[in-house]
Amino acid sequence: MKRILLLTLLSCVGLCTQILSVFAQQGEKSVGINVGYGTASSFESFRLGAEFNWNATDHIRLSPSFDCYFASSTSYVVSADVHYLFPIKNTWQVYPLLGVTYTHFMTNEFGGNIGAGVEYPISSSFYVSAEGKSQLTKDFQQFALAAGVAYKF
């Protein structure tokens, strides 16, 4: 069952990437760092993360990320999310997100992400953001909050 779920998730990400790559020249890119906190029933920790964002269209953005958790052992999460951007008054943007995740805490597991975020430009090249998402796997469920800054290019 895990293999079927993994294959399905990877196929969906691959298909979305292929479909959206047609629009690559339409959007901007950004790279950012963030800090946050993750909490689960058996795990709570501060985290540091890095992300790359690519606006495939005016409203759809792909966002792969890597988060390192400062627990007693090496813990990290690799995610690939899709954001649907809603501009508000030409400054704020809010977005729901949906994606896939690979977690390495006590065990290695694949799963999904669901959440939302908001961002605000502080200049023509930088923006600040806040995001919350649930990371769901078969044996592990975590809610992660993050605040960050990103550079647009």
Label every model-predicted segment.
Residues 1-28:
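Cleavable N-terminal export/targeting peptides
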Residues 4, 38-40, 152:
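Generic structural motif
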Residues 20-62, 66-68, 100:
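Short glycine/proline- and aromatic-enriched beta-strand/turn motifs that initiate or cap beta-hairpins
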Residues 36-46, 68-77, 102-110, 135-144:
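Solvent-exposed loop/turn segments connecting transmembrane beta-strands
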Residues 51-128, 151-153:
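Gram-negative (and chloroplast) outer-membrane scaffold detector with strong preference
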Residues 127-129, 141-146:
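A general structural signal for short secondary-structure boundary/capping elements
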Residues 131-133:
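C-terminal binding/interaction regions
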